[in-house]
């Protein structure tokens, strides 16, 4: 069973089976949700399977692999990096590097286009840039300050705030993220309705006494990225 709702005033949690349990202390790890509606056209394109995110492991992970395998040699794979903070800071750069490695071996005419909404690589920048230069030059192209604002799943087109639209063959679009639904619905995601603010000495919510929030749903502190070793 699992929790479907939290009442921080009554100090109860509701389960999927309909039962309600009281708590004295609640430790909550609600994870993240993807804000598909923040990019025009993405929700529909994702629902149809035309544009995958594969940021939550599951069917989309397998689906993205199949799309890459089916892509003709000479095609372009477009991956974006959302504005920080987001789950697993090095993740998009790792994924781009892995796909570039696959292309180098099996589709050498293909290209990885990595579009970053941030001004620079957000994690391990020197390491990634060094590998891209030494191992994937001509295969992986990195462009900073490229915030995706819209997509067209049918034409495989990506749109931006200022730059001209770009077309690709496989689009892997990652929207902005926020704390999981439980945190939002219960009011615990109190920072811009996105992240949970906590006391970093105890991880107790600043708006819900006796509720301790851990993991990616917490607003990041300096030197505390949204990554596994911190969660």
Language-model region placement:
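Residues forming the flavin
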Residues: 21, 78-80, 87-88, 95, ...
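Residues at the starts of beta-strands that form the adenosine-phosphate
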Residues: 76, 109-113, 210
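FAD-binding core/adjacent interface of flavoenzyme oxidoreductases
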Residues: 1-94, 101-105, 172
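Amphipathic alpha-helical segments in well-structured domains
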Residues: 61, 92-96, 129, 228-231
């Amino acid at each position: 069973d699992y929790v479907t709702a939290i009442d921080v005033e009554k100090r109860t949690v509701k389960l999927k089976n309909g039962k309600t349990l009281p708590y004295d202390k609640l430790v909550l790890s609600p994870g993240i949700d993807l804000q598909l509606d923040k990019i025009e056209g993405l929700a529909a394109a994702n629902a149809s399977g035309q544009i995958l995110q594969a940021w939550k492991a599951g069917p989309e992970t397998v689906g993205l692999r199949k799309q890459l395998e089916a892509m003709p040699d000479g095609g372009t794979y477009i991956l974006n990096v959302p504005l920080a903070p987001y789950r697993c800071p090095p993740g998009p750069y790792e994924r781009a590097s892995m796909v570039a490695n696959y292309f180098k071996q099996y589709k050498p005419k293909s290209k990885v286009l990595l579009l970053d909404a941030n001004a620079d690589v957000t994690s391990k920048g020197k390491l990634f840039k060094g590998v891209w230069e030494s191992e994937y030059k001509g295969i992986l192209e990195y462009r900073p300050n490229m915030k995706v604002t819209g997509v067209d799943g049918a034409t495989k087109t990506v749109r931006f705030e200022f730059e001209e639209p770009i077309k690709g063959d496989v689009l892997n679009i990652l929207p902005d993220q926020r704390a999981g639904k439980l945190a939002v619905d219960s009011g615990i995601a109190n920072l811009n309705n996105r992240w949970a603010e906590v006391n970093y000495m105890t991880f107790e919510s600043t708006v819900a006494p006796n509720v301790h929030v851990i993991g990616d749903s917490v607003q990041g502190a300096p030197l505390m990225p949204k990554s596994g070793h911190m969660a």
